[in-house]
């Protein structure tokens, strides 16, 4: 079968990725020497994995068999995919749920015929995961995201924004547990090189987490102007989401301005429930940051009326508001399957607020100091459990714990 030089280079790089992933699982048969034994020389394998070309396609065929993959290129399918990808990105840009769903189904109907072939197997997986993300709100595992990162540089440009969206869907949730890893991974996917405007939301998030507020403000203005000019009200709501977060840090007077913008937008236009839920959640966060806990609790609750997403994180924030208002802790129940998708630190925080009322204060203190403290790096989470600990030591008189808590936090955040 004839395969273009460009695709051969990509296939070779994929072979390198797959071999390294297998070798990382301590499978000795995937070392350079063992892997190519009887097929080609070590130098030839190194050349192939770096994107160089072999003189014989048979080498690729035999190497791919080790991963149960076939060798080939189908230009007719590629051309059809490029057309459908354009439609998919347009649907994502306006968050047209039904068109996203229908387009991915069409794409995978094409790909299912060739999903046993190298490159197409990756596309089939990417599209399947994209479907799960947009249609079923899937949370991805670290292993899945790491694989997407491993193949990112080797994918054709037209598919990179799809990968960026998948990778960012995980990073926006997991950043609180490892900010350094978040920054490294965000820099890896080069959001500034994205071809589609909606991917810039990842850049807004990056500016927020790295506290580059001036850059974030400039990008916000640019995106608000663009989406107003294109009458894309769903994405305009997304811009407002980030505006609430930004201005809660730098200029709280602007928050009320954006609340009025949201009210006007949601009154005039029919918008997806998930987007209204997100905007209410971020209004709640802006009030939370200003210690206006009653308003925050109101909007967190309103958010869940429209869409029950990210229940674990939302539950922690709701519990904090209830705690500070002197209310009984009453947070959303999370199914086990969904719960297991979250990082350990977030699960431990949620479990804390699920402790029975009868659990003694000294047991709660120990839980915070032993189980939670090693994972606390995010300012919001630190503040939540610093407050909780201060309440507990009033009962136990163990004020030394507050000093130890502050000392350990400084170690984590210095």
Give the predicted meaning of each segment.
Residues 1-26:
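A short, Lys/Arg-rich alpha-helix, primarily the initiator
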Residues 23-47:
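Short alpha-helical DNA-recognition segment
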